[in-house]
Amino acid sequence: EPKYVNLNTIHSPEQMAKLAKISAYFAGLPTLKKDKLRQCQYEAICNLESSFRQGQRRALICLATGAGKTFTACMAIYRLLTYTPARRILFLVDRNNLGRQAEGEFGTFDLTEKGEKFSNIYLTEFLRSTKVPSSANLVICTIQRLYSVLTGQELQDDEDEESTFNNTDSKRAKLAGQLHLPNDFFDFIVIDECHRSIYGRWRSVLDYFDKARIIGLTATPSEETKEFFNNNCVANYTLEKSIVDGINVDGRIYRIRTEVSDRGGQIEEGEKYTEVVKRTGEKREVRADELIPYSASDLDRA
C-alpha cells in the first residue's frame, strides 16, 4: 500500500529540491511571477536565471535609464538569497551617493513571499568602514571601499566618493600580503553602472573574488563591458523601446544661443581658468599669462 505523510504546509521549491536530493545550485528557484514587474524586468530576471542554470558565470543586464535596473536587481538578489545556497551578495556602486540610494531601495523593496521588506529579512550593510559584518547577507559599497576592506587601509572621504569612471587609465591597485577576506567570501557580485566600475585601477579587486558569479547592470554597455561579460547579454532593453512602451518619454531639444557659442570669446591676461585632462579627469587651476582668444568651434574640444 502507498505511504503518505500529512503536511501542515506545502513544501517550497527549495525544500522539494532538498527532499528530491537535487544538488543543482539553482534547482530551488521557483517560476517567477510577473506581478508588479514590468515586462522588461520580468524577462531580464528569467533570462538571467536561465543563463546561470546553463552554466554561465557572468551575465549582463542592459536596461534603459528609467526602466528600473535597481528594482530588477532587488528582485534577482532576493530570489538568489531565498531559493539558492547563496548567503552573501556584494552590490558594487560607482559612488557613495549611489550606494545610499541603493540601500534605500532595498529597504523599501517588499515584493517578497510574505510582503516583508527585504531589509527585514536579510541583513543589508552599506559599508562605511574596513569591517564587513559576518552576518551580512547583502553588502553595498564602492570598489574603493572594498579595496580598503581587503587591505585594512583606511580611505579618505574623497576617495570613497570618487567615480571610478575617471580611473580607467590609472595604475592598477595591487593586492599583496595577507588579505582580510577569502576569495570565496561573496557568492554573487552585482555591479551597478558596470560600464564604469570594473576597469582600470581597481580591476584587480574584482578579479580577486574569482569564485563569485557576476551580474552587470548598465544602460550604456561598451564593447569592453560586453567582452568582460563574455558577450552574455541576457537583456537589452533600449531607450527607444522604453519610449514605445510608455516607460520613458521622448526628449525635445531646445538650443540656446549665446554670444560666446555664436562668436567665441577670450580669456584675459591674468585671468584664472581650469584645465581638465579629459582622459583622467585631472583638474588644475591656471592663470593666463597672455590674452587667449577662442572661437565658437573651439568650445568643448578635447
State where each predicted segment sits.
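ATP-dependent helicase/translocase motor core
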Residues: 1-88, 93, 97, 101-113, ...
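Alpha-helical scaffold elements adjacent to nucleotide-binding pockets in ATP/GTP-utilizing enzyme cores
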Residues: 76, 101-106, 201-208, 228, ...
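Short glycine-/polar-rich loops that comprise or flank the Walker A/P-loop
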Residues: 85-87, 135, 185-186, 210-213, ...
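Conserved nucleotide-binding/hydrolysis micro-motifs of P-loop NTPases
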Residues: 96-98, 144-148, 195-196, 220-224, ...
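Conserved motor-coupling elements within RecA-like helicase/translocase cores
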Residues: 124-139
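Structural recognition of the conserved hydrophobic beta-strand(s) that form the central parallel beta-sheet
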Residues: 139-142, 213-218
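SF2 helicase catalytic motif II
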Residues: 157-215
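Interdomain helical connector at the RecA1-RecA2 junction of SF1/SF2 helicase-like NTPases
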Residues: 226-302
